[in-house]
Amino acid sequence: MSSSKEQEAQKGKQGWITPAVIPPEEWATFRYRGKTLEELLNMPMDEFIKLLPARQRRSLKRGLKPEHRKLLEKIRKAKRLAAQGKKVVIKTHCRDMIILPEMVGLTIQVYNGITYIPVYISPWHIGHYLGEFALTTKIVQHGEPGLKATRSSLHIAAK
């Protein structure tokens, strides 16, 4: 019984979203709404938008914000440099950017309010927001109860 509690505590320390890094060899089995990654990459943006859930579809139909356009330019530049063998770090505050097929394979550092969290984009992230993978809060690890655990216990005389 205690071992399962210890395992749960260990999971809590890791965070409730554990980074599932799936190797590129397994990407061939990926399907998004019945389409392979290659089909998604070759698909025009209008057709891709039709595959997304309503919230993301509505957001992209309205057009990209200027910050999102800048981020896409950085991503395209990083892809070109990666083909030449150079590694470029992409840092962004755009937590509300929807992950598109052209972002797959890159590591984007997303700001969580304190630091930049590296997020490796796999095909399974398509359609989600960047901010979903860079949590802004820590999971609470409560201390042990006792003296000085609360404000009211500060005035109790220690023995």
Swiss-Prot record:
Gene Ontology MF term list: rRNA binding; structural constituent of ribosome
PANTHER family xref list: RIBOSOMAL PROTEIN S19P FAMILY MEMBER, SMALL RIBOSOMAL SUBUNIT PROTEIN US19
Protein family (similarity comment): Belongs to the universal ribosomal protein uS19 family.
Alphabetized UniProt keyword annotations: Ribonucleoprotein, Ribosomal protein, RNA-binding, rRNA-binding
Pfam families: Ribosomal_S19
InterPro entries named in the record: Ribosomal_uS19, Ribosomal_uS19_CS, Ribosomal_uS19_euk/arc, Ribosomal_uS19_SF
Any one of the GO BP annotations: translation
Designated name of the protein: Small ribosomal subunit protein uS19
GO cellular component, one term: cytosolic small ribosomal subunit
Task of the protein: Protein S19 forms a complex with S13 that binds strongly to the 16S ribosomal RNA.
